Amino acid sequence: MMPSESGAESLEQPAAQVGTGAASAVATAGAAGGGPDPEASSASLGRHQSRLSWPQVKRLDALLKEPIPIHGRGNFPTLSVQPQQIVQVVRSSLEEHGLRVHSVRLHGSAASHVLHPESGLGYKDLDLVFQMDLRSEVSFQLTKAVVLACLLDFLPAGVSRAKITPLTLKEAYVQKLVKVCTDLDRWSLISLSNKSGKNVELKFVDSVRRQFEFSIDSFQIILDSLLLFGQCSSTPMSEAFHPTVTGESLYGDFAEALEHLQHRVIATRSPEEIRGGGLLKYCHLLVRGFRPRPSTDVRALQRYMCSRFFIDFPDLVEQRRILERYLEAHFGGAEAARRYACLVTLHQVVNESTVCLMSHERRQTLDLIAMLALQALAEQGPAAMAALAWRRPGSDGVVPATVNYYVTPMQPLLPRAHSYPTWLPCN
């Protein structure tokens, strides 16, 4: 999932209703071929691209065919949506309304999972990127209207569609609507709700300055050939007969980025361009066992990310909202025990690398992180709560169930009362 950028504008205006005769969508894509040819791959592709192997293509096909529930609010029924179905329906409808889609791509953690599922990161959101032209406000509004109208095609049989409007569908099934329209960024995002956090995120991109934070999340997989193969071929895929699927790395070097993913290496380019959420992703990777590349200036990298975090989220209330939302999205269910480890790591990074705040602002943020860490520790049970010292968790992110009574004195986890007065904003 990609968070709202600075300057993002919510798409809240009601959209005109668009026809829904797109259930039998046919996506236009490159011709599907047989198995990958290594020699052809090396000769025809740049360093930022690579052909997917047969096991990777199988994982991609299974991911696109796995039904994902889109949960409705109130009395609206749950929709069962296969990613490949909604891509085909939306793409066909967009092109019927004069909006040409250049390509459709799988982006982010899901693409990384397809390429190397043993990384330990898994994936939550399913990021589907539609590369297209968005040159006017009309294009943005038409894109939103098309997606909302296409949701009608996925309503269960027997549900009356007569009085359902696009505004009703937005309120029922859309978790987030974002529009970014600046000189360098022109894109919109429609996120469909899923209670377990596996949201289907449809992103419509004309241009964007940066779509990745680190090399390991810079992958995009072009879906066009696989989608076309599924529509046109009656023969099941096999190792000897399957479409040629291409992956790209926005980091710039596909092989290097894949090696980073396989060996749990944190690397990036132009760290000053990383958005505010990159700090949380960095701490997340550290907790998962990733480590910065030896040649990385870690202190400079952390300073860039801390500065950007406080530029994008200057308000303490907003910081808490972002932290809680990130923890819920990435450390839910069985992963909840890792929240404490992530917050301990975040506290350490902010404490060591923040140079852009006044001292009282820095203390307020550190106290907020400490409070959330204490809550996460309490959720691990009474035994964990017995250790209220600031202690580094084990490699699995879990505080040991048995806590020794003798604890070496360390920095306390509980926030201290500060003597400074409440600061009021200047007029």
From Swiss-Prot:
Keywords: Cytoplasm, Nucleotidyltransferase, Nucleus, Transferase. One of its GO terms (cellular component) is cytoplasm. Catalyzes the transfer of one adenosine molecule from an ATP to an mRNA poly(A) tail bearing a 3'-OH terminal group in an ATP hydrolysis-dependent manner. May be involved in maintaining the translation efficiency of at least some genes through preventing degradation of their mRNAs. Prefers RNA molecules that are adenosine-rich close to 3'-end. In addition, may inhibit cell proliferation and cell cycle progression through ubiquitination of beta-catenin/CTNNB1. Residues 15-30 have a biased composition (Low complexity). Residues 1-49 are annotated as: Disordered. SMART domains: DUF1693 (SM01153). The gene is Tent5b. Transmembrane segments: none annotated. One of its GO terms (molecular function) is poly(A) RNA polymerase activity. The lineage of its organism: Eukaryota, Metazoa, Chordata, Craniata, Vertebrata. It is found in: Cytoplasm; Nucleus. It is an enzyme of class 2 (transferase). InterPro entries: TET5. GO terms for biological process: negative regulation of apoptotic process; negative regulation of cell cycle; negative regulation of cell population proliferation; positive regulation of translation. Its EC number is 2.7.7.19. It comes from the Eukaryota. PANTHER family: PRION-LIKE- Q/N-RICH -DOMAIN-BEARING PROTEIN PROTEIN 44 (PTHR12974), TERMINAL NUCLEOTIDYLTRANSFERASE 5B (PTHR12974:SF46). It catalyses: RNA(n) + ATP = RNA(n)-3'-adenine ribonucleotide + diphosphate. This is Terminal nucleotidyltransferase 5B. Belongs to the TENT family. It comes from Mus musculus.
